[in-house]
């Protein structure tokens, strides 16, 4: 029998946000005390707590610490000269060290450690993953001025010797817009599928069944008309549409990157199809 409407509705509920807000405020307080050599950085949430897609059990809070007085871009050397851009003597490595020092001074050395991509901070509230980044400017081919760019952020991964570029502000803005376009069904639907995934993992499904970011981006590509009515309607409409869709054309919620590909920040079509099969089996096998 299918999953009951009451169960799907429970799965759509948002998790608590108060402690995440206090975690964010704690990180901000730590950074406010520091004397920054190149101006105070911008501090903001990203991830499920920012996007209102957090569910019960979500723990780590993603906090972005972004330096805007220094930036990277996609311009050629000649284009940079034309705009008068010069190389900064204050690098991402310098900024990373300053952020690490600010957090260590506030929380203590035992509470701050380096992760692969983030600084892991144990606050008195929730653990925080602090992304230390600088502004990234993506200029279009026919740019009109130095201010004609799409804002992202970028950070270095030392263990892999590469830079990562992401667009968390666009991810948030596009998700908020889609939520409005679907009469506020989009974000509850994300939470419904996240909880369904968690339920399946608890029943023995693979731990990497559908990472939250990829799941959110997958659902972003579903037409607005497939959301709404009842949660049963939405579950079936979304899954049935995705099973027939050409996944190779899917974009991330930020609108800038392909969802599927070979880079570490991309998903695989095979794993997305696997997720859809698990959702199918959940729907048809509920209660058995």
UniProtKB/Swiss-Prot annotation:
Record bears the keyword DNA-binding = no
Quickly give the catalysed reaction: UTP + ATP = 3',3'-cUAMP + 2 diphosphate
The record's cofactor note says: Binds 1 Mg(2+) ion per subunit.
Region Disordered, annotated ranges: 1-23
Show the GO MF annotations.
Answer: ATP binding; metal ion binding; nucleotidyltransferase activity
What does this protein need as cofactor?
Answer: Mg(2+)
Which SUPFAM superfamilies does the record cross-reference, listed alphabetically?
Nucleotidyltransferase
Biological role stated in the UniProt entry: Cyclic nucleotide synthase (second messenger synthase) of a CBASS antivirus system. CBASS (cyclic oligonucleotide-based antiphage signaling system) provides immunity against bacteriophage. The CD-NTase protein synthesizes cyclic nucleotides in response to infection; these serve as specific second messenger signals. The signals activate a diverse range of effectors, leading to bacterial cell death and thus abortive phage infection. A type I-B(UU) CBASS system. Cyclic dinucleotide synthase that catalyzes the synthesis of 3'3'-cyclic UMP-AMP (cUMP-AMP) from UTP and ATP, a second messenger for cell signal transduction.
Q: Does the keyword Repressor apply?
A: no
Q: Could you tell me what this protein is called?
A: Cyclic UMP-AMP synthase
Top-rank taxon: Bacteria
> Recorded E.C. number(s)?
2.7.7.-
Q: Where does UTP bind?
A: 46, 62, 116-120, 166
Gene Ontology BP annotations: defense response to virus; nucleotide metabolic process
Residues that, per the record, bind Mg(2+): 60, 62, 129
Annotated organism of origin: Rhodothermus marinus (strain SG0.5JP17-172)
This protein's UniProt keywords: Antiviral defense, ATP-binding, Magnesium, Metal-binding, Nucleotide metabolism, Nucleotide-binding, Nucleotidyltransferase, Plasmid, Transferase
User: Binding residues for ATP, per the UniProt record?
Assistant: 46-48, 194, 212, 265
Q: Which family does it belong to?
A: Belongs to the CD-NTase family. E01 subfamily.
